Amino acid sequence: MTAPLAGLRWGLGPGWLLRLKRCRRSAPWDLGIRSSASRKELLGLFSLNNDILSQSCRNYQAVLCTELTKPLIIRNLPSPSLQPHEVRVGVHYCGVNFADILACKGLYQEKHCLPFTPGMEFSGMVMETGANVSTVQEMLWPIPEGVSYEEAAALPVSYGTAILALDHRARTQPEETVLVTAAAGATGLAAIDVAANVLKAKVIAAAGSDYKCNLALQKGAAHSVNYTQGSLKEGVKKLTDNRGVNVVLDAVGGDIFKEALHSLAWEGRIVVVGFAGGAIPSVPANLLLLKNVSALGVFWGRYREEDFPVFSSSLSSALWHCQERRIQPHVGAVFKLEEVNEAFSRVTQRKSTGKVVISMK
């Protein structure tokens, strides 16, 4: 009997232990078994196969950050014993996120004690369940039929963020105009996908090259602006007949955020999901007043602690929309585990489009 499942945690590797209660950030990039009540916020997708429950791993490979700002290393570690409230997971794919890179530089909001295994999302197979596990509620989600392991690993962080930002926070309505910055990144393409194909909004994509703008158009954006070739604000004004946009999803920060904020229409909403540009901007309160606009934030992982039903719903919705083919995650590159540092460099150097994933197989 096989039942597809999906789950959440932090780490890089093919199989690990997952404690079925809310934990502190841990990582999916362990190539064996991993779980710790001292970590939080891991996302992934699995399928349960009772035919292999007799299998156990004596050792596993794990990606470790042993020194901040230094290359990651891979080590063979002994597998811990399966505890009553844990499941053993064989990981197939892991997603790479900008937050992982920040964590390995010591720049992320949540700090980790060295050494730690980075990572936030994965897909794989449940290999074994602890004696007290009767159902999976807070860490694992079913992978629907027709959704691949590769697609599943690309969904949680990017699409969970996009759904929360555009639907739950900004309350985006059909036919509204949505501006997406960093449009060719993982969250940007997910936001375009959700806005255009689920919420039926009109999307303006903003990116830093013609190639990235063209990719955003292929993925559902109605228009694009290359903000390295002119003013984002002026580009949006031309595309909207000076009306501005109803919603902005910004992952860049800095000057791009400021231009996007000035591009809002009356009663517009700007949702901050990150600061990939490095600079954290301030918000001029007089502009909020004059245009009656709202500035909102989304830290998707925090919802797991503060409002778990909303958190879980965002991931379940992403999986369902993917099964129905309303959305389709864009995997821009696949790396092997031993190429993890190259994968990090691809994201850091802005060479990637969509989601970068690590294959454990």
Predicted regions and their residues:
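A short N-terminal beta-strand-loop micro-motif at the entrance of redox/enzyme domains
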Residues: 19, 38, 49-53, 64-93, ...
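N-terminal Rossmann-like NAD(P) cofactor-binding module of classical short-chain dehydrogenase/reductase
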Residues: 179, 248-249
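Residues located in well-ordered beta-strands
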Residues: 61, 73, 78, 90, ...
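Glycine-rich phosphate-binding loop and adjacent beta-alpha segment
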Residues: 199-200, 207, 255-327, 352, ...
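Mid-domain Rossmann-like dinucleotide-binding core that forms the NAD(H)/NADP(H) cofactor-binding site
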Residues: 150-230, 235
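N-terminal mitochondrial targeting presequence
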Residues: 1-60
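Glycine-rich beta-strand-centered segment in the early N-terminal region that forms part
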Residues: 78-96, 107-138
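C-terminal hydrophobic helical "lid"/dimerization subdomain
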Residues: 2, 7, 26, 40, ...
